[in-house]
Amino acid sequence: MKIDAILSDYDGTLCPTSSISQDNSNSSSRIPERLEKIIWNISEKIDVCIVSSKDFSFLHRRTKFAKILSCIMGIETLVLKRHKLKAVMRENQYDNDDDSNNKNINNKTNISFGECKDKLQCILSSHIPSNKDILQDNSRLLDSLADEISINFKNITIERKFTSDNQILAGITIDYRHLKEWQSYKRKTEPLLKEMIQRNIQSSSSYELYVQTYSTHPFIDVYSVRCDKGLAFDATIAELACFNADDDRRQSILYLGDSENDNLAFKRADVSIGVCSDKRLNPKLTCQYLVQFNQLSIFLKRLQYNNFVFSDKLLLNL
């Protein structure tokens, strides 16, 4: 089977879960350089798209190779112009993709990809399928909920996720992955967090928020509307079809993901591969194949060298 496009999650798939920084700075939470180079090379041959719970502001700086960004679990999907490669100085957390747990915070590298200076004129189109009145109403509720959680749970961080125009708060992530004993925190404290969220939802809104929990991952996501990776996958494929209208052949899609919220996308893909980037996590994935994070770049390079014709052999002896 020849792969026509690659759709991928970001957090935990292209960048290890343990490396995602809460400062949201441009130098943090980057794809390891070796893997990033390979993905850039692939994007010159076939479409590469990101399907993520992260927002546009976070993803745009880190995934300039992407043709389409489906952000905040599909709440907003953007089609982008192709960025040009440019070498600039940046700080990278990782020397390479050999071991996701070996941080090298002080490592300096002279390569960064796809520097964008067009002040977001790279956006060809943006699509938000949900009712904007509901999004606006629940934006205020999400902001209030984030503040209340921050006051009552001092040792967690809150990531606010905005639409690309920064006008609507469409989701929040309640994150405690930075805690040394986060597994204990998940067992003992996460249930209290869930109770607070549900009380807030029941007492404050005519439009119910959507809560995404995980069996082993150290965070909770709350969104302004119901959303999932299946809908995000469908939105991405629909946008791709518009750009390939002259080709009536059905495209074959490879999907990469790492958590339970990727399962709906796994089911839609022709080839689905789960990526394991943290040994402490044991999510229940419905993918066809599993690879370790430090094997991903090897597999993708093999796929490229094989002219994007997928076979099981590409996953042997990684």
Language model features: what each stretch is:
Residues 17, 29-97, 106-160:
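Active-site phosphate-binding/coordination module
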Residues 8, 51-54, 256-258:
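Short His-Asn-centered micro-motif
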